[in-house]
Amino acid sequence: MDKVIYPGTFDPITHGHEDLVYRASRLFGKVIVAVAVSSGKAPFFSLEERVKMARNVLTGYSNVEVTGFSGLLMEFARQQDAHIIIRGLRAVSDFEYEFQLAGMNRGLYPDVETIFLTPSEQYMFISATIVREIARLGGDVSKFVHPLVIERLRQKKIEMNNGE
């Protein structure tokens, strides 16, 4: 059974992420959605919140597992005995960074391969960063994220406004 890892911060999980999980789940026996701590970014949602949202959104997939991780992705891949990494490419601008990352990952773990998937056309423009900004400013993000995520974005905005 081919086991693949789809890593990301998923802050929050979007329809674009869901689309890639759906397509990866049809291609591979097991998809591990690996929600990263990502010390280089200041996440809007905590790791626990992001894992919970992803689990709730992806609950209908029998061959998908959602888990959080910290540290190097290649160490996580070794622990999971996974040799394939799935990465999404929305635009040409994503390619250069992802290409470099794939090369560095192969240098750390020569047995790993990176497979690039492009999202369906209707999801190519979705960015979790932009979704957060639209939600923060009170805009409608229902075209971009699952209803459960919309509710969490609303709750988070209230918490932030109350200084929690």
From Swiss-Prot:
Its main location: cytoplasm. Its cofactor is Mg(2+). ATP binds at residues 9-10, 17, 88-90, 98, 123-129. GO terms for biological process: coenzyme A biosynthetic process. It catalyses: (R)-4'-phosphopantetheine + ATP + H(+) = 3'-dephospho-CoA + diphosphate. Pathway: Cofactor biosynthesis; coenzyme A biosynthesis; CoA from (R)-pantothenate: step 4/5. It is an enzyme of class 2 (transferase). Its EC number is 2.7.7.3. GO terms for molecular function: ATP binding; pantetheine-phosphate adenylyltransferase activity. GO terms for cellular component: cytoplasm. Homohexamer. Reversibly transfers an adenylyl group from ATP to 4'-phosphopantetheine, yielding dephospho-CoA (dPCoA) and pyrophosphate. This is Phosphopantetheine adenylyltransferase. It comes from Nitrosomonas eutropha (strain DSM 101675 / C91 / Nm57). The gene is coaD.
